[in-house]
Amino acid sequence: MEIINWLSLAMIPIIIAGILLYGTIKKVPTYESFVEGGKEGIEIAFSIIPYLVGMLVAITVFRSSGALDFIMDLLKPAFSAIGIPAEVVPLALIRPISGTAALGMTTDLIAVYGPDSFIGRLASVMQGSTDTTLYVLTVYFGAVGIKKMGDALKVGLLADLIGVVASIIIVTLLFGSA
């Protein structure tokens, strides 16, 4: 166990030293390459800010308008009828939109129901099995100038749906139902 702890502490310095050693062997100007990469990273960060602000405003309007609550109220009875706790419905809906909001919901569910409860486990697995599809598409596609993202959106939302369904099945099989 002690060797694992040592390895986990030493891994990042070992990787950095390995990259520097490899660069030196290949005669790559490692510092200059690092600085150039940093400049490119800053340029990319600045270029995605408008898309990020637009997405955050849209999320805020969606939540503040009551549209999210309306959709959740419509879906909760259907989820409850098939044995899915109504408490995780908001998480399943908000996760493709906002990672921060979804993490906040997951944290709240764990605080209320406990990490070892069915709801806590389901929320945790759901959080890890899905992605912020709309955020990813808006920010990254916007950064590279892709305007038509319809197919990517369909596939991304389908992947999120599969992640939610898989979360429910796996948590139910491993830990029993609510």
Swiss-Prot record:
Q: What membrane topology was assigned to this protein in its record?
A: Multi-pass membrane protein
TM segments?
Answer: 3-23, 42-62, 155-175
Q: Which family does it belong to?
A: Belongs to the SpmB family.
- The gene it comes from is spmB
UniProt-recorded name of the protein: Spore maturation protein B
UniProt record, GO biological process: sporulation resulting in formation of a cellular spore
One Pfam family in the UniProt entry: Gate
Tell me which stretches of the chain form a coiled coil. Answer: none
Sorted alphabetically, which PANTHER family does this protein's record hold?
INNER MEMBRANE PROTEIN YJIG
Q: List the disulfide bonds.
A: none
Q: Where in the cell is it found?
A: Cell membrane
Q: What does this protein do?
A: Involved in spore core dehydration; might be involved in the transport of something into or out of the forespore or could be required for some modification of the cortex peptidoglycan structure.
